[in-house]
Amino acid sequence: MELLIQLTSLLLIVIAGPLVIALLFLKQGNL
């Protein structure tokens, strides 16, 4: 069960990471 939680958290980090960076770049570009 812990392995599944670790995999899902890792997947969230892998997906959310680039999204947050893209949002930051968009905000800087709009300014």
Swiss-Prot record:
UniProt xrefs under InterPro entries: PSII_Ycf12_core-subunit
Subcellular location: Plastid, Chloroplast thylakoid membrane
Coiled-coil ranges from the UniProt annotation: none
One of the protein's GO biological processes: photosynthesis
GO annotation, cellular component aspect: chloroplast thylakoid membrane; photosystem II
Membrane-spanning residues: 5-25
Principal cellular location given in the protein's record: plastid
Pfam families per record: PSII_Ycf12
Keyword RNA-binding: no
Membrane topology: Single-pass membrane protein
UniProt family annotation: Belongs to the Psb30/Ycf12 family.
Subunit annotation: PSII is composed of 1 copy each of membrane proteins PsbA, PsbB, PsbC, PsbD, PsbE, PsbF, PsbH, PsbI, PsbJ, PsbK, PsbL, PsbM, PsbT, PsbX, PsbY, PsbZ, Psb30/Ycf12, peripheral proteins of the oxygen-evolving complex and a large number of cofactors. It forms dimeric complexes.
Name this protein carries in UniProt: Photosystem II reaction center protein Psb30
